């Protein structure tokens, strides 16, 4: 092999190594305790004159990007309802359901809502919730007074693709803003990766 060919080969190998490192950065599990995002940073929103709806994907690929208190709050929420989650998943024949925290906020008195109307669109496939676990009493009544809130854990038959694009819908309302969150998530992944190598984990102690 000539020196010129050897130099070209080394350059190509170097580029391949860098590309692998970048893709591996996203694939590597994110250590908790180093993030700084808030729940609002992960939330999709949609609304009309009656309702505001907030949708937070509960995917371990992104929840460790949250600040410690926010991360622990969501982790505790899921673990508290783990038995119910596993029961719903088992009935649906799903081992790893997609999870989301969904909240409905009323804008006026006596607003009714239908939990099953909320859907997830992924790669032209519509997913309806396979199960809903109420977190507040108002969720069961499906009716809210002005400025009241009702929340629940939603289960879908597939994991929510937080590394890809997806759309949520409720009646005529939609939100496809997840793509716009990717730059925020990528920057936070890079910060978390750097902090995890140089700083002690934030345990709150």
Regions found by a protein language model. Give the residues of each.
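Hydrophobic helical h-region of N-terminal Sec-dependent signal peptides
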Residues: 8-12
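Bacterial N-terminal signal peptides that target proteins for export
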Residues: 1-7
